[in-house]
Amino acid sequence: MAKIYFIAGEMSGDFIGGRIIQHLKNNTGVQFVGVGSKYMEEAGSFKSLFPISAINLIGFVEILPHILKLKKLIDKTVEDIINSKADLLITIDSPGFTYRVAKQVRKLLPKLKMIHIVAPSVWAYKEGRAIKYAKIYDCLFAVLPFESPYFTKVGLDCRYIGHPIMEQEFYSDKIALRKEFKIDENEKVLCVTLGSRRGEILRHLPVFIASIEEIFESCKNLKVIFTLVNPANEVIIKPFLENVKFNYLFSSERLKTYALSDLALAKSGTNTLEIAASGTPMIVAYKVNILSFLIIRALIKIKYVTLINIIAGSEIIPEFIQHNCRATLISNKLQELLFSSKKAYKQVIESQKILQKLRFKSNQLPSYIAAEIIKQEFLEPKIKL
């Protein structure tokens, strides 16, 4: 029986891993072990080596206080991979952790086959990372259509599989969803996404609340839904809402929330693709530690942070980044989209066109394409087909 060691450092990676495992375990004799969360554990019937929240870090500076803890987790993971006697190592995104693990494993197990899923954003900054990945990995699965040439030119086998956003099932019946959430017909719904990390939430929450307070003055029928990636984050957010004037509620059913909303105020990230795919207009705001920002600004080669804008080469979705992440600027744009259906509709239509570019040309699911490559090219001699 073949054995695959998976590593995912975030929930988005865990989702990808879980979907691939579901395809791999059909009609194959494969055992799964590694580091992941609910999707991978459930699909692969294994217990994660440790909770992925332990490695869910962000930023250049923010990671420094956790460097010793991170090193211990890297060493622990490397040791577990060696002891597992796995036939294949698959790492997913989270390059700050997964690359360091893979680099050590390559030194200790030079013959072990290794695949990485979700290419590092070398098109945005540090293009030299492509060479580093070529020295470590046997194959790379890219999720954006323009990424492969950056890696193939340095000798790394890179396959475009399509974006995982195409795996999601999105809701379209806004009326039914609003009834389910007990939203009145005359209410304007603004959904707010703050991310999953405590630091991100605390950094964005004050300016987001101030922005909402400003638009509430001209939109008394506003209802705000805070979407929770982790339900436990409600206790972080609630103290900030004690004296607000607007009505609000919490929801961990993010895809339903995106679909029923009139507008979204979103932290930059994968959530912006989900909101766009739900047919909801949005504004994106984001800021990081000032030292992290200075480092990023010196390295980065792109004008936008939202993937839809990056692919389009223009600002389809309004962005308010770092020093522009201010309540007055954000609230003005929120009001503009909330009360101008024409502008909101235009954003939705243009976003949908960009999303179609993330779909594999055969319309096959990314996880299915990935699983087929893994089975046929990396595991075939060891599994029962």
Curated annotation (Swiss-Prot):
Pathway: Bacterial outer membrane biogenesis; LPS lipid A biosynthesis. Signal peptide: none annotated. Its EC number is 2.4.1.182. Keywords: Glycosyltransferase, Lipid A biosynthesis, Lipid biosynthesis, Lipid metabolism, Transferase. SUPFAM superfamilies: UDP-Glycosyltransferase/glycogen phosphorylase. InterPro entries: Glyco_trans_19. It catalyses: a lipid X + a UDP-2-N,3-O-bis[(3R)-3-hydroxyacyl]-alpha-D-glucosamine = a lipid A disaccharide + UDP + H(+). The keyword Glycosyltransferase applies. The keyword Transferase applies. Pfam families: LpxB. Coiled coil: none annotated. GO terms for biological process: lipid A biosynthetic process. One of its GO terms (cellular component) is membrane. Condensation of UDP-2,3-diacylglucosamine and 2,3-diacylglucosamine-1-phosphate to form lipid A disaccharide, a precursor of lipid A, a phosphorylated glycolipid that anchors the lipopolysaccharide to the outer membrane of the cell. Belongs to the LpxB family. This is Lipid-A-disaccharide synthase. It comes from Rickettsia canadensis (strain McKiel).
